[in-house]
């Protein structure tokens, strides 16, 4: 994944024809022994310093690399510079937006032999260029009910994420209801199961 940043809602509405910005969360599904991600900067820098680092290929000296493990969580607020490294697989839960500003792409070229477009001016407009502390895992709230553990992973104004841990020793049902206010996305990250709904089943 390229080194990138997403705008806030306010910036996107003003500069991107009324679109939404993007705040997101990563849940690590799998990670190799050396897997890392980029989360913010390890030291303060100015826009001019970052621009020079992008131009001369030394931008990585400013980026904070964080070792990751299976089941880690990272809440990535709009404006946070970030990237996924090799050996990592994450589930990305995000605000309903596709706005991404690429800050650096490791000088890679596409199938056409050309480097991918960067969005340096807009990226520097929205990026938080202050040094970041190592990201803390969000507080997890765990509740038990009838053989199912419900774990609140993240709650913000854009989305809520829960992990359901089901007792596999017996067939267990977990009920969800979708309505006109919000929808639900179900992702099986371990084991197997069946989604049942009014018109049928999905294994």
Say what each PLM segment does.
Residues 1-70, 85-192, 196-202:
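Active-site region of the double-stranded beta-helix
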């Amino acid at each position: 994944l390229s080194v990138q940043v997403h705008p806030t809602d306010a910036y996107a509405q003003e500069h991107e024809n009324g679109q939404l910005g993007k705040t997101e969360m990563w849940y690590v599904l799998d990670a190799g022994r050396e897997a890392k991600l980029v989360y913010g900067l390890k030291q303060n820098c100015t826009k001019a310093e970052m621009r020079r680092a992008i131009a001369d290929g030394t931008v990585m000296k400013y980026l904070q690399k964080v070792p990751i493990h299976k089941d880690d969580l990272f809440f990535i607020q709009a404006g946070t510079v970030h990237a996924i490294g090799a050996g990592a697989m994450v589930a990305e839960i995000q605000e309903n937006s596709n706005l991404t500003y690429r800050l650096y792409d490791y000088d890679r070229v596409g199938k056409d032999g050309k480097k991918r477009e960067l969005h340096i001016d807009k990226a520097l407009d929205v990026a938080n260029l202050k040094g970041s502390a190592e990201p803390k895992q969000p507080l997890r709230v765990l509740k038990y009910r009838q053989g199912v553990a419900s774990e609140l992973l993240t709650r913000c104004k854009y989305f809520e994420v829960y992990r359901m841990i089901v007792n596999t020793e017996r067939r267990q049902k977990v009920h969800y209801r979708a309505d006109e206010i919000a929808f639900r996305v179900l992702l099986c990250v371990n084991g197997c199961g069946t989604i049942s709904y009014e018109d049928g089943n999905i294994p």
